[in-house]
Amino acid sequence: MKNSARVSSVLSPVRSPIVIAVAALVTVAAALAAAGPPAADVGPTYAIRNCRIVPVTGPPVEKGVIVIRDGLIEALGPADKVKVPGDAEIVEAEGLIAYPGLISALSNLFIEQPAPARTGAPAAETEIPSLAGQAAPAEDRYPPGPGQLVLDQLKPKKATVESFHKAGFTTVLVAPARGIFEGQSVLLNLNGEPIGPMVLRNGAALHINFTTERGGYPSSLMGTIAHIRQSFIDADYYAARQAQYAKSPAGLKRPEYDPRLEALVPFVRDRKPVVFQCNNQEDIKRALKIAAEFKLNALLAGANEAWRAADALKKSPVPLLVGLDFRPPATSKYATQGEDLRKKAEAEIYPANAAELAKAGLDFALVSGAGADGGTVLRAVRTAIKAGLGKDAALIALTIQPARFLGLDRALGSLEPGKIANVVLVKGELLDDNAQVAKVFVDGVLFKYAEVSK
């Protein structure tokens, strides 16, 4: 798998009052989420001593120290080279391994109501219809739609936070899951129960699904594709008219304000990220065509059949947010040719998706997806490893790679001075079956869990 610096950030630069501190020759990183809620309160200064440090972006430190101050990593390195500050609270970590907090770049965490069932109507064709000159249907001109912010639907629960902490996760992208234009996601740092201090970036990405809801509009796959295309065409035209009027309004009729098209403009004109949910290989091909047509800053989520579309993805490489649901989609031959083949696919073929992508040299992150608790997600990662994905590749796909995809690699995704102090202390190797998470730091806030067994 390629995990080099060639991977560009596909989300807009991070903007907020949090300034990422620097150490040595590290330059000052960008700040987080403009106009977002205030940063989380930070605890005291900590010095984590005598742990093995796995930075991800550098070689391990066998017996090291990590100093955390004001929610940031102030220093880290071998114990004989890092001075422990006199005001630091000592966290003794003999026998533990320190990892950067894991990142899930797609989840439905804290969404109280489950998403309505989808029809999953199959279609083999990937032809995209031409709709020039037709207007987007009125039935979908108002929320739920592209302007809907999933943040408004979230209700954090302590048990859910703890579940993800105990699996090593500290950061999640929470996305809506209803409709075609599902709305906009929010990026959270899991630093407690109130939602406000968790927010790293609201309106992080626009999410689109090709599968219509039962009884929804449009009612067919071709109608859905046409609706998506026409919406982007209309948004581009709307933006052009607004820009023309703003530049020279004299003699021009004022363009009518349209909240739905207004919400789409940043994704069409400013290249804010658009995440396509791809439930099968045909969805991947459709998404690639639409992304190319409108020059979208696209990511493909789910992608559990990406291995079957590897050639297309090599020609048009985009970030892949690979889900850990190993059930074959309804459109697959593995789901339609008998129970024995379906079970074999679920146990052997689909768990190898990530391993095949790594062999093909495609960049991907592993994501928790919908409806799973932290423990279930981590078990699925281990299943992917047993199916051939290397442990190092899996760790990269859960840390620095999603951070790169989210435009956060200067703040998260590895253990380095100046980055946000998201640190997980583990008895054993995190991705092993017998690993136990002992302590978790998020934004420098310490969460203590049950004492690990000796």
Stretches with model-predicted labels:
Residues 1-16:
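N-terminal secretory signal peptides that target proteins for export/translocation
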Residues 36-39, 44, 53, 57-101, ...:
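Histidine-rich, glycine-flanked metal-binding segment
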Residues 51-54, 404, 416-454:
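C-terminal cap of metal-dependent C-N hydrolases
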Residues 114, 127-131, 135, 139, ...:
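His/Asp/Glu-enriched, well-ordered alpha-helical/loop segment
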Residues 157-305:
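Polyanionic/metal-chelating signatures
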Residues 291-297, 314-321, 361-363:
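Glycine-enriched alpha-helix->loop->beta-strand junction motifs that scaffold or abut catalytic
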